[in-house]
Amino acid sequence: RKTLLTFGLNLSSSVVLTPGDSVGEHLPKSGITFIIGLVVDDIVVIEEHLRIHTKARVLVQFSDIALLYNEFVQAFNNSDGAKHLLFATSLPHWADVDTTSETVRRFHEAVPEVEKWTPLSLLGFATGRLMQRNLQRMDLATSDLLSGLFFNETFITVDDMQYGAYKDAEGVATAEESLSNFGATDISVWSMARALRSDEPVLQDPMSPSMVYTVPNGNALTPAQLDWCGWCRFACADTGSRLTVFLCCIMRNKRDNDNAPKELADPVTLIFTDIESSTAQWATQPELMPDAVATHHSMVRSLIENYDCYEVKTVGDSFMIACKSPFAAVQLAQELQLRFLRLDWGTTVFDEFYREFEERHAEEGDGKYKPPTARLDPEVYRQLWNGLRVRVGIHTGLCDIRYDEVTKGYDYYGQTANTAARTESVGNGGQVLMTCETYHSLSTAERSQFDVTPLGGVPLRGVSEPVEVYQLNAVPGRSFAELRLDRVLDVLDIFGEGTAASTSDYSSTLAELSETAQAIAVSLQSLMGVFTQAQRQGTLMPFCERWRVRCPRKVHPRGTTATVRRLSVALQ
């Protein structure tokens, strides 16, 4: 009742069956019926009812599916009613041989017998992996310490499964008031047809429902009172909208800085992200990119919140993220790649763009470049790549931490920020790179949860010595082109020739410019990105003369780079 009320629905009726009662007598010919605590004999009755009454739907608990899986399979196999039996789960498909889920892959390796691939066995395996991970962190294992670990960490990720948030409620709650989803996230709705065949689509994409419920009480309004209130709310609408605007004005400078690293003596782990070839994508898909980038921003921000990290800033489609925990940072980067892989982008044009770009690069090159993804078998490609590709760089170290009175937030400067940005900028789309400082900041138990490949020493611009870099294999099986070490990296390289320019060139120097200068540079990018080099030079001249910024008269490949950089600083 609480769930239905929260989402604005009503419970038409409820029936408590006694032993010997048949569930079939109470199933309606249409609508949704939720059955709790069914018995084996109910399964055949439900199958027959759903097969005959195509407008009826029956929702059962996942625990019933798991415990009585063989009976459900026997009853619903090859039945039209399978599409109308529904349940919710956060598990990936236990029998998907083409899975992208690391949990299922490990499960299949541990349990090679296909007949043992059931939801209950996968649930047990995932639980075992969770306990294995937690016990590695404990010198002494007791029930209190184990439960405390969940609440202390809030979010826990094992392979590709995330658990949490676990929040220890204040005070003592009665059983009637306590509500829990036991830490499940990314809950999707399946039909029994999908349980039988992994290629069947889910009915509801994964979501993490709110745990804030509207609790009914004895003083609830009657329908007549609600009708009267409906008339009244029109009179209040204008007042409410004005109040909303007023509150927004008050709160617009408010920023949540709770998760921002603030201690100068504590190492900070910085993450930089960037969408590969976003400038060219905007030029070729201007009608699709706004929604795609908005989805990208929303997903990244949800991960920042999930892992208690801090959004420092965004420039274009690049994120700078600060983390108190290197483990949380690496978890965030890994889940980012997995979520983008699983996301339904609603189009294939981004994948087609990357394929065409790689093929064009191969044709125009000297024959040494081999497209890493363009020539993959379509089925293999689908398991490894999907939609926009985001590169990620991670580095850990001490920072110059400053509070900005304008943005009301914290910013991070110095060599740590520069190294993190440079690490991201040499990567490829879909690739996650971390420095040895980040890797060695992880405990042995934490490292065991990630698949990494050492890449050796990598020269980074602005860093005196080559940096040991590790590749996080967030999506096993992906291959990448060589690191982009030949890139000329400066804040305004995006004004250089070529269609592969992207805002990573900004992210690589975020730590070197102020917030205002960055905003000016982004605006100039948007205005001048489609101009030729000569047109840019001519457009910049009046601004430079007005603001007394030195501007070289001769047009050369790097002319506007230095000019616009100086102009951005002068105008801030």
Swiss-Prot record:
Q: Give residues annotated as binding Mg(2+).
A: 274, 317
Q: What membrane topology term does the record carry?
A: Multi-pass membrane protein
User: Where, in residue ranges, is this chain on the Cytoplasmic side?
Assistant: 252-572
Q: Which SUPFAM superfamilies match?
A: Nucleotide cyclase (SSF55073)
Q: Which cofactor does it need?
A: Mg(2+)
Carbohydrate-modified residues are 10, 77, 152
Task: Alphabetically list the UniProt keywords.
Answer: ATP-binding, cAMP biosynthesis, Cell membrane, Glycoprotein, Lyase, Magnesium, Membrane, Metal-binding, Nucleotide-binding, Receptor, Transmembrane, Transmembrane helix
Which residue ranges traverse the bilayer?
Answer: 226-251
UniProt record, GO biological process: cAMP biosynthetic process; intracellular signal transduction
Report the GO terms under cellular component: plasma membrane
GO molecular function annotation: adenylate cyclase activity; ATP binding; metal ion binding
Which EC number(s) are documented for this chain?
4.6.1.1
Q: Name one Pfam family in it.
A: Peripla_BP_A-cyclase
According to its UniProt record, where is this protein located? Answer: Cell membrane
Q: Report which reactions are catalysed by this protein.
A: ATP = 3',5'-cyclic AMP + diphosphate
Q: What are the disulphide bonds in this sequence?
A: none
Q: How is the cofactor bound?
A: Binds 1 Mg(2+) ion per subunit.
Domain (Guanylate cyclase) ranges: 269-424
PANTHER family listed in its UniProt record: ADENYLATE CYCLASE, TERMINAL-DIFFERENTIATION SPECIFIC, ADENYLATE CYCLASE, TERMINAL-DIFFERENTIATION SPECIFIC-RELATED
Q: Which family does the record assign? A: Belongs to the adenylyl cyclase class-3 family.
What job does the chain carry out?
Could act as a receptor for an unknown ligand.
Protein name per UniProt: Receptor-type adenylate cyclase GRESAG 4.2
Q: Which gene encodes it?
A: GRESAG 4.2
